[in-house]
A protein has these predicted regions:
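Short, well-structured N-terminal submotif of metal-dependent ribonuclease cores
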Residues: 1-40, 53-67
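Active-site neighborhoods of divalent-metal-dependent phosphate/nucleic-acid chemistry enzymes
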Residues: 2-4, 74-119
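Generic structural signal for small/hydrophobic residues in well-ordered secondary structure
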Residues: 9-10, 48, 86, 111, ...
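Phosphate-coordinating loops and pocket residues in cytosolic domains that bind phosphorylated ligands
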Residues: 18, 50, 128
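Residues at the C-termini of beta-strands that transition into short coil/loop
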Residues: 42, 79, 138
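C-terminal structural segments of small proteins and small subunits
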Residues: 121-125
Length: 139
């Protein structure tokens, strides 16, 4: 079995931390057991940190983010390849009249550039991205 790298997007990270759903946790455990890598983009990490820094957020949120991030294999750094893929995605989707949010485009671009399977429970948005390998672990 070839080893995969699963990139979790911000929505699925928030869902996991907030709801702790058995089905998703089971898929995470299975991926780890099969020695697949579990990563997030630096973009997702930034979004989680920003959410935790919100003055209205409970101090527990920062602790949850810290605990979650510690269990990941990596936070992938934003690099030129990710920027180039993101630019391609945004250009293509704008031309088609089906743009997605800037952060979602950046996460999708990063997943494509890094050869990752993007795990999200926001498939409606990401399904517009040509060539992306998506999985929704909530299904």
């Amino acid at each position: 079995m070839s080893k995969k790298t699963y990139m979790l997007d911000t929505n699925i990270c928030s869902f996991i931390m907030r709801e702790r759903p058995d089905a998703v946790l089971g898929k995470l455990e299975q991926a780890v057991t099969n020695q697949h890598r579990i990563v997030v983009s630096a973009i997702t990490y930034s979004e989680m940190r920003f959410g935790a820094a919100n003055p209205k957020a409970s101090p527990k949120v920062a602790a949850m983010v810290n605990a979650f991030v510690e269990r990941l294999d990596a936070i992938l750094p934003w690099d030129a390849a990710a920027v180039d893929q993101t630019t391609q995605i945004r250009t293509t989707l704008a031309r088609l009249g089906t743009p997605i949010g800037n952060n979602d485009a950046a996460i999708a671009g990063h997943a494509l550039a890094a050869g990752c399977v993007l795990v999200t429970n926001n498939t409606r948005e990401f399904a517009r991205v040509p060539g992306i390998d998506l999985e929704d672990w909530t299904q």
